Regions:
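Active-site glycine-centered loops adjacent to acidic/histidine catalytic or metal-binding residues
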Residues: 108, 168, 207
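Active-site-proximal beta-strand elements of phosphoester/diester hydrolases
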Residues: 201-205
Length: 232
């Protein structure tokens, strides 16, 4: 019987109701299960960070809306999102997986944290900073992402481009020398990143989990992530 890797999925919370409940789509779990993994929701308890890092094969860092540190943004800008206890837990988990060279897949906010932990910088308001850019914060809108040849993302999806959804206000706009952009929107905005020094640490800005029940080429990202976790 094929080993099904255990994937830690840090839960998101509804920051609009004072952080009193976890709140996220089931599609993250469906996507991991469909790709052959066993997803487990991880709550915000510091006592289980070490256990999660040691006992789970891969980390899925999901989307969400919460405040990042000011030094993660380009000069004189700061987060417009509410504070959340998710930040220190996710940061510790991700740092643990990075240190152990275990697979990480970041989606939306998860991609942004992966980038900023490696020295990248963001803007809290993409439309204000880049008025000529596409409307990236419009639900129901789709745009093309061009994929960098030879990247982990390109190998995963087997294509040079794909059509994705787009609903994010914040965006990674400055890369460090530790990170490469493996996907960009038609307007040049960074839509996917990778950490070359890590066996499998990639992030996508769009919400691939929204396609979990569809025949979408991007779902191969989950398959590649689960396979990397199986081999970790």
């Amino acid at each position: 019987m094929t080993h099904r890797p255990r994937i830690a999925v840090l839960l998101d919370e509804n920051t609009s109701v004072d952080g009193t409940r976890y709140d996220m789509t089931k599609n993250y779990f469906r996507a991991i299960a469909s790709a052959g993994g066993l997803p487990f929701g991880i709550p915000y308890h510091s006592e289980i960070i070490d256990i999660t890092v040691s006992d789970f094969d891969g980390l899925l860092a999901v989307g969400g809306r919460f405040a990042y540190p000011d030094d993660w943004f380009i000069s004189a800008q700061s987060s417009k999102a509410p504070a959340s206890e998710r930040l220190p837990i996710e940061r510790a988990l991700m740092q643990g997986y990075l240190q152990r060279q275990k697979p990480i897949l970041g989606i939306c906010a998860g991609m942004q944290m992966l980038a900023c932990l490696h020295g990248c910088r963001m803007t809290p308001d993409l439309r204000a900073a880049y008025p000529d850019a596409l409307e990236h914060d419009k639900r129901g809108q789709y745009h093309r992402v061009d994929v960098a040849p030879g990247s982990t993302l390109a190998r995963a999806i087997g294509a040079s481009s794909l059509s994705v959804n787009s609903f994010h206000r914040e965006a990674v706009v400055e890369l460090s020398d530790q990170v490469v952009a493996s996907g960009r929107a038609e307007d040049g905005i960074i839509e996917a990143i990778e950490i070359p020094s890590h066996p499998f640490a990639i992030g996508v800005q769009w919400h691939q989990e929204a396609f979990a029940l569809e025949d979408h080429p991007g779902n191969s990202i989950f398959k590649a992530f689960v396979e990397a976790s199986r081999q970790a």
